[in-house]
Amino acid sequence: MKLHTLRPAKGSVKTSKRIGRGTGSGRGGTSTKGHKGAKSRSGYSSKIGFEGGQMPLQRRLPKFGFKPLNKIEFKPINLDELLELIEKTGASVIDTALMNQNGLIGKNDKVKVLARGEVKSIKAEIIAHAFSASASEAITNAGGKVTLIG
């Protein structure tokens, strides 16, 4: 056995259909595409979602929902994070600038304070864009002050 004498096993290689090589080949003329119509033309490819003239699924189903253009997104900050910030900095006023300096929020973020974490006592004024009802209650009960921005 030599490399130049190697052949594939019998029946393992299928001969390809030679289409459009004259009428004598058996596959000439219309080249297995039938007569006329879009599918017989060169460059034809079916449209994605085309269902043969039936109204396609993406057009049968209704549109729904929208995204409001003027939605205000708040960055949630929890009380336990604020307590850590107070311990770390020792500040008596916690505002957005201080939160930004310590990496809690971005420069243009609006802040909403949420009530996760236990609060024993807060001797600080917390300034934010919004507070949850339970967070503002927890802060005032612990001796802190709540101030809303605009």
Curated annotation (Swiss-Prot):
Question: Which keywords does this chain's UniProt record carry?
Answer: Ribonucleoprotein, Ribosomal protein, RNA-binding, rRNA-binding
GO terms classed as biological process: translation
What is one Pfam family matched by this protein? Ribosomal_L27A
Bias kind Gly residues: ranges: 21-31
Keyword rRNA-binding present in the record's keywords: the answer is: yes
The answer to keyword Ribosomal protein applying to this record is yes
InterPro entries, A to Z: Ribosomal_uL15, Ribosomal_uL15/eL18, Ribosomal_uL15/eL18_sf, Ribosomal_uL15_bac-type
Q: Where is this region: Disordered?
A: 1-51
- Tell me a GO cellular component: cytosolic large ribosomal subunit
State a single Gene Ontology molecular function.
structural constituent of ribosome
Describe its partners and assembly state: Part of the 50S ribosomal subunit.
PANTHER family associated with the record: 50S RIBOSOMAL PROTEIN L15 (PTHR12934), LARGE RIBOSOMAL SUBUNIT PROTEIN UL15M (PTHR12934:SF11)
Function of the molecule: Binds to the 23S rRNA.
Q: Which family does it belong to?
A: Belongs to the universal ribosomal protein uL15 family.
Identification of the protein by name = Large ribosomal subunit protein uL15
